[in-house]
């Protein structure tokens, strides 16, 4: 069973609704990618990337993962990130930027912890060195 299915099964009062739905995700994802692209350790991974498309897929992924009505239609995390040289250090940097973006958007600390806890298992599919995420 995939992470999206697990998250949907356990949420009756979805995180998606609690944080403000699609519009809130748009704000968070925009801020998140500003932070990521300003990070010299991460920006190189996005050279030549269609950022508008990526932001749309990121919003779609978060919406589905957080209990929203939108299905995620993108490729599996392992497939998308394979061979990119992403380490657990990079994953943790990205998670830190996500936390900062959620905080800046006014998401409560307990909800941020839920979100970060939900994405932590993705480290195994995203990072090539398979260490444990520190989110």
Cite the ranges covered by each PLM segment.
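Core of compact, soluble alpha-helical bundle domains
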Residues: 1-135
């Amino acid at each position: 069973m995939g992470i999206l299915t697990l998250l949907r099964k356990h949420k009756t009062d979805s995180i998606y609704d609690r944080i403000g739905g699609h519009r809130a995700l748009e704000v968070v994802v925009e801020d998140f990618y500003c932070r990521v692209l300003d990070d010299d350790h991460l920006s190189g991974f996005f050279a030549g990337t269609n950022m508008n498309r990526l932001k749309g897929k990121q919003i779609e992924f978060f919406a589905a993962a957080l209990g929203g009505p939108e299905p995620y239609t993108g490729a599996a995390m392992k497939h998308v990130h394979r061979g990119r040289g992403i380490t657990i250090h990079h994953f943790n940097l990205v998670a830190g930027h996500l936390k900062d973006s959620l905080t800046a958007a006014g998401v409560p600390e307990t909800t941020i912890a839920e979100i970060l806890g939900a994405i932590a298992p993705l480290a195994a599919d995203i990072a090539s060195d398979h260490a444990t995420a520190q989110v």
